[in-house]
Amino acid sequence: MQETQWTEEDLRQISDQGITRSEVEHQLELFEEGFPFPTIVQAADEEHGIRVLTEEERREALETWASALSDPSLRVLKFVPASGAASRMFRDLFAYMEGGEATESVQQVLDRMEDFAFYDDLNKACMLGERGKGARRLIDAGEGRTVIRYLLTEEGLRYGSLPKALILFHKYPDRPRTAVEEHLAEGAKYARPVSGTVHLHFTLSPEHIHPFKTLLSRRQEDLEDTFSAEYDITTSTQKPSTDTIAVGPDNRPIRDEEGRLIFRPGGHGSLIENLSEVDADIIFIKNIDNVVPDSEKSSTIIYKQILGGVLVQLRDTAYRLMEELRDETRASESTIRETEDFLRQSFCVEIASHTESPEEGDVVAELERSQKKESIIRTLRTLLNRPIRVCGMVRNEGEPGGGPYIVRHEDGTTSLQILESSQIDHEDPETERMFRESRFFNPVDLVCCTKDFRGNTFDLNRFVDKSTGFISHKSRNGQPLKALERPGLWNGAMAYWNTCFVEVPADTFNPVKTVNDLLRPVHQAEEE
């Protein structure tokens, strides 16, 4: 790798960004070397890695969660990544507005414009700007592009530059709701402890903070009255120190018109920094666009409570075992055996020596033979004393994508991981077969515990696999560039968490990736 010659201005800019020179040079090395593929043991399934709960187990989990919420000291929080702009939702409409053809998806929007929750606002914008001509009148007169212009640009609703959080998603008799309002409604149903306060944290782009707070100032009190809850809402932005340097095709830093280095956001994995700074005992993580109207929320609410109950059960067991393993000289062999079984059965964590030599017997027998009891206990404590996450997984009925896998690490241990397609070695026939035959996908439905058995918050950066991530190819002013994406939030950023996968039904996953998704029946449900 050719050494980069930094100018004084470069070093000043790097420092102002909150990044060290060594970190930037490490990023340049990653562009040169790429990222290694993980060693996949198998795709997680019902037999290995994914819990399919029985009716009794679901009932017990619900009872556990209800009991947890009755604890006045419990702090529950919903963490919602919401920094993405809604522009991707309207990609086809942008193309149409700029002169493209009315594709099938565009025509559906024009034909069913009245079915959108934002129609009344759009109609008013059209009438104001077009001398009393409403949206439907303009569409019928062949002026669909005019209507779309009022939808997407500063002339009207500005939806092309707003975040998804502020887009009106669903109709209600009193007034429509945005995506963020649906998260508030949802939180009141499963994340409200006995105190009555629902804590939510949204990550946003800096330019969206003000309109976000403006919306809350208008709507929060009404929602508190509707759901008999008090909302404590906080926000944060992605830290500049998590940005990554951009390079050209030759892997050398590129510069802007003023000769300055170019840094780009490092992807949602950078939000591990934001997650580290929230204080909560239990944290629910869910994407901003996966919400439904109240009449369709029951399955989501029940399974959020179930996942929360499973997490509390796992957390309580882990805390108890950590207490019993504190004194390496006094921990019993039954506790050692129970810990090993707990790690294997709950998190698919196999200890290297046991995994590689099963014929030699269980860990306890090995300890007796090798006289290394204290060393093994330290290993068990290291594996046990980690953040915990319970992740809902949905059966895969379409094309494979990001999903659950059992992975073997360099030290020989195994664990459960969520891998994206870009992390899969598609050139390896066996790995590609496992990818193609995977039965579940990741809907981003997590419940997390980020505190240790003493009640201290973990340093989440200690549990990131920095060898993960990927390189994306972009362009700037028509010139190609390469960008470095940090380990994804629920991928490499949580690689060394203890992970449990639980099957959840498909009706808990209803994301809005395009504006047309809002026309699907689940998002058009009539509210009484």
Where do the PLM segments sit?
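Domain-scale recognition of functional cores that engage charged ligands
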Residues: 14, 43-397, 406-417, 422-423, ...
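Short low-complexity stretches enriched in small and charged residues
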Residues: 29-37, 153-159, 239-242, 454-460
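N-terminal regions that are enriched for targeting/export leaders
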Residues: 1-47
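Primarily single-stranded nucleic-acid-binding OB-fold modules
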Residues: 348-389, 398-403, 413-419, 425-528
